[in-house]
């Protein structure tokens, strides 16, 4: 089907999760608007409620009022943490405000490098002691967190968020360098400042945080979801569609816009809206995922579907996450010709998608299968949608 019409983009999932976790820093009332209605946000709200947060959600689930008084439990249970990778983000605020935390480790005690090590080693520099026992991180900072100079060994969105939140209540000054600079991190930083935090970006990937003792009430509107926006732009490009995307900041989407122009889409952009018209001929392209402002790993699966329709062979190199090619077996069921070599997918073009019964493995795989179904011949049934 050719998509035509106008779509208003939801609030950002990837900004909502750390912002919700950051509310744990304060005992004041906080109001958040433009929350997206997605499973991970609901799970994060349940996690906060299980710890004692008082949460009121509006009928349309778009606005939330939250208050975290002194009766917050400093434990985040496995049951909720296991369904959401971002749950680890409560570690920083709990240690900053209460000096202790018992948080289920995402993925338990796997041997070898775990991304969580970046969080823990950085927190150690701020005075945190920790042990991992039975899949739980038992951490404490008996004398409170102390400001430190921290250079992340690798760019990590989660570690940047956790340490930025934690540093807001630390004694003295913290300087974080080699930070992730995704727009969602800038949104988190703006939210923390709206509560009274002292945060200054002193370089492209460097931020200075001066600890404060108390926070004030805040009303904050969460930014738009750039991954949803990118997905909708691809939906417009894939089958000669004609879509108007609103509720966005087009300057944040420059990478996606440039990519789609290269493959042949016609794009007319204004500050808060984009009109995209898909071309009959889709040009092939080779891409690799990388930290912002590079191609987002969260849009890789959707781009793969688009490149299945290209005129020649394309490649996608996944440089951020392992296990990010899980949609490929399902796309093959729909007639896609894709070969995986290590962290690279080789995509043969000119695919004529055929309807099939398929199963989603994660949120982005769900979106990619919907895109494939849009231009498939026949009926497609997608189960386990996220």
Residue ranges and their predicted role:
Residues 1-386:
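Short, structured segments at the rim of ligand-binding sites
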């Amino acid at each position: 089907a050719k998509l035509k019409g106008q779509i208003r983009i939801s609030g950002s999932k990837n900004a909502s999760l750390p912002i919700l976790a950051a509310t744990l820093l304060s005992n004041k009332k906080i109001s958040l608007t433009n929350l997206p209605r997605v499973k991970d946000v609901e799970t994060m709200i349940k996690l906060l409620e299980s710890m004692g947060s008082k949460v009121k959600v509006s009928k349309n689930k778009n606005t939330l009022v939250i208050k975290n008084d002194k009766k917050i439990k400093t434990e985040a249970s496995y049951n909720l943490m296991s369904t959401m990778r971002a749950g680890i983000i409560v570690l920083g605020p709990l240690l900053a405000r209460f000096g202790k935390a018992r948080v289920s480790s995402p993925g338990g005690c796997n041997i070898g490098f775990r991304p969580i090590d970046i969080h823990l080693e950085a927190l150690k520099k701020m005075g945190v002691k920790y042990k991992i026992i039975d899949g739980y991180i038992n951490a404490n900072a008996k004398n409170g967190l102390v400001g430190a100079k921290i250079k992340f060994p690798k760019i990590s969105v989660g570690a940047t968020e956790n340490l930025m939140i934690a540093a807001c209540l630390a004694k003295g000054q913290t300087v974080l360098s080699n930070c992730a600079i995704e727009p969602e991190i800038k949104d988190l930083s703006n939210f923390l400042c709206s509560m009274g935090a002292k945060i200054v970006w002193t370089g492209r990937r460097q931020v200075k945080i001066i600890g404060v003792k108390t926070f004030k009430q805040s009303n904050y509107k969460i930014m738009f979801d750039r991954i949803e926006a990118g997905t909708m732009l691809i939906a417009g490009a894939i089958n000669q569609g004609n879509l108007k995307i609103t509720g966005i900041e087009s300057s944040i989407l420059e990478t996606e816009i440039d990519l789609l122009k290269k493959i042949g889409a016609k794009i007319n952009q204004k500050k808060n809206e984009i009109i995209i018209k898909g071309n009959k001929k889709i040009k092939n392209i080779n891409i690799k995922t990388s930290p912002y402002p590079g191609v987002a790993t969260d849009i890789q699966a959707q781009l793969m579907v688009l490149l299945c329709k290209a005129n020649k062979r394309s490649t996608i190199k996944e440089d951020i996450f392992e296990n990010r090619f899980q949609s490929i077996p399902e796309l093959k069921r729909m007639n896609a010709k894709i070969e995986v070599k290590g962290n690279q997918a080789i995509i043969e073009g000119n695919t004529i998608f055929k309807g099939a019964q398929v199963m989603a493995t994660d949120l982005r795989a769900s979106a990619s299968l919907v895109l494939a179904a849009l231009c498939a011949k026949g009926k497609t049934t997608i189960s386990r949608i996220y």
